[in-house]
Amino acid sequence: MIDAPPLPAVTTEPRAIAGNGSSMIRVCSLKKKIGQQKILRGIDLEVATGETLAIIGRSGGGKSVLLKHLVGLMQPSAGEIWIQGQNIIGMSERQLGEIRKKIGILFQSGALFDSMTVEENIAFPLREAGERDPKVLRAKVAEMLDVMEMEGQEDKMPESLSGGMKKRVGLARSIIRRPSCVLYDEPTSGLDPVVADSINRLIRRLQQRFGMTSVVVTHDMKSAFDVADRIAYLHEGRIYFNGTANQLQQSTDPIIQDFLLGRSNGRGD
């Protein structure tokens, strides 16, 4: 990795990040092998509370695999993942369920239920948690629609929504329980530039309004530059670069330049 030294592997509770408060996420020496293929080759990464981190890299380079590890949807071959001071590796499903309450996920597709209205989709996590009061559900959904700038859309079905609207509904559903952290899997994928820009603004607004920590997996460099406090470049299963957008743009490293300019030169993830 360039521009910043790698984080050391640890076996105790993660330390706080100087000047940025406590650590929301800390990944230590994370490895994942599927068959004979090494997907993750020793990831060391830390995300401060309230920070927005963008993870960039070539398609098939392990970005989404890393994201799934952060919520326990995949188990690593080796390494540790700490969420707010708790090592989630080896946790039971019940324990992981408690961790997942702290984390919202926006999947690339939005993952809406086709048979449910917008209101029902957004309220789904609350119903799953046992909330049954119609007034409470309507009030919380209305708040989310206001945040998403989708007032009056609660009775629509997903099939009638544009791609950008589906993303907003998916995001509203993922944050309705006020998680500490939101994970975004390619949030602007398949959107035109204007709609993508509106999603980027929304990600920043959520950080500012609710203080949410965000991890944004993307291959959209404009999105990464727009939303991120810090950018991590995943290359060949490792964090090759970890720094600010300015540091990334000013880097003369040939591997980074190839990625930014879209050149392959026989290299890739």
Segments predicted by a language model, with ranges:
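Helix-to-loop junction immediately C-terminal to a conserved catalytic motif
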Residues: V71
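Conserved ABC ATPase "signature" region
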Residues: Q86-N87, P134-Q153
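Short coil-to-helix segment of the ABC ATPase nucleotide-binding domain corresponding to the Q-loop/switch region
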Residues: M116-F124
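Conserved ABC ATPase signature
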Residues: M157-L161, M165
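A short, proline-enriched helix->beta-strand linker immediately N-terminal to the Walker B motif
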Residues: I176-S180
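Catalytic Walker B motif of ABC-type/P-loop ATPase nucleotide-binding domains
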Residues: V182-D185
